[in-house]
Each structure stands twice: as C-alpha cells, then as structure tokens.
C-alpha cells in the first residue's frame, strides 16, 4: 500500500473483488496494520516471488496503464499465488488524476470521449481484452457500457 503524500490517504495497493464477475464492485482492504488477502492489485510497490514471476511472466504488453496491474494480479492468482496487502503504508505516491475523468460534470462530448479512450481511461482494445478475460460470459456488455454511458451523459 502506498499513500498520497498530500492527503495521507491510500493511493494504490491491493484490490478486492467480492463478486464472481471481477469487474464489479472493486474495493480496497483497510490499512489497519494487519495484512489482508487481495484478489488483484493496483500497485506502485509490489514484491513478486521469483517462482511466481517465472510462472506468470511479466506484465502483458497489451495493457499500457492500470489494467496491466490488475491483469497481472489476476494472472498471479490464476497461477496459484496468493496476494496480500501489507496493512501498512510502505511508501508514498500521488494519486494520478481524478478517477474516471470521462464522468466529469460539464465536460463536452469530445472531452469525455478523449478521456475515456486515453491511456488513463479505458482504451478500446485494452478494455475489450480485459473484459474478455475477466467479465464472464456477458463481457461484451461490460466492454460497451462505459462508452455508451460516457457518450449518453448530458452536458452540464
């Protein structure tokens, strides 16, 4: 777990996926001093045992940003590894940008579209592959949903 140096809040770390659909309801374990099991990660400070790295390989080159971390964590678990968040902060890292900038009220259609398909959003090819791997049999709906929502939002 790393914390934002300005706010003191958790910026990146382990992620919990309480549903069988790994794209629904992502949460974070508490930073309360106790190590916690995780389903995947969004990590800026991650230790991977050599035997796991040999089995899983490196980050998948199809992903350029956050989905790469999450995909790697899921692949580690699929390979039989356990993921654990430390329960304490081990470093600092600013939270990079607002979450889901394409949802920002008042943004024009063009601004929402650019933010959505940009590297910190949900680039079409990457999001499609991520959904195909982890959203189950209805993955196409999960893949299309953010694009439809972003384009359908009323201008503010």
Segments from the language model and where they lie:
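Active-site-adjacent helix/loop segment of glycosyltransferases
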Residues: 74-155
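A short, conserved alpha-helix in the catalytic core of glycosyltransferases
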Residues: 40-41, 46-57, 62-89
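A recurrent flexible, glycine/aromatic-enriched loop bordering the glycosyltransferase active site
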Residues: 26-48, 112-116
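Residue-level signal for pocket-adjacent positions within structured domains
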Residues: 11, 33-36, 54, 58
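NAD(P)-dependent short-chain dehydrogenase/reductase
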Residues: 15-24, 39
């Amino acid at each position: 777990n790393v914390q934002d140096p300005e706010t003191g809040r958790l910026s990146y770390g382990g992620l919990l996926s309480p549903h069988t659909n790994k794209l629904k309801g992502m949460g974070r374990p508490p930073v309360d001093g106790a190590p916690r099991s995780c389903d995947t990660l969004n990590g800026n400070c991650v230790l991977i045992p050599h035997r796991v790295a040999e089995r899983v390989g490196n980050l998948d080159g199809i992903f350029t940003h956050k989905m790469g971390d999450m995909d790697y964590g899921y692949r580690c678990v699929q390979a039989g590894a356990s993921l654990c968040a430390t329960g304490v902060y081990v470093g600092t890292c600013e939270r990079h940008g607002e979450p889901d900038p394409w949802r920002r009220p008042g943004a024009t259609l063009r601004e929402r579209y650019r933010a959505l398909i940009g590297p910190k959003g949900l680039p079409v090819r990457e999001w499609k592959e991520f959904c195909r791997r982890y959203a189950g049999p209805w993955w196409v709906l999960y893949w299309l949903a953010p694009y439809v929502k972003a384009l359908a939002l009323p201008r503010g």
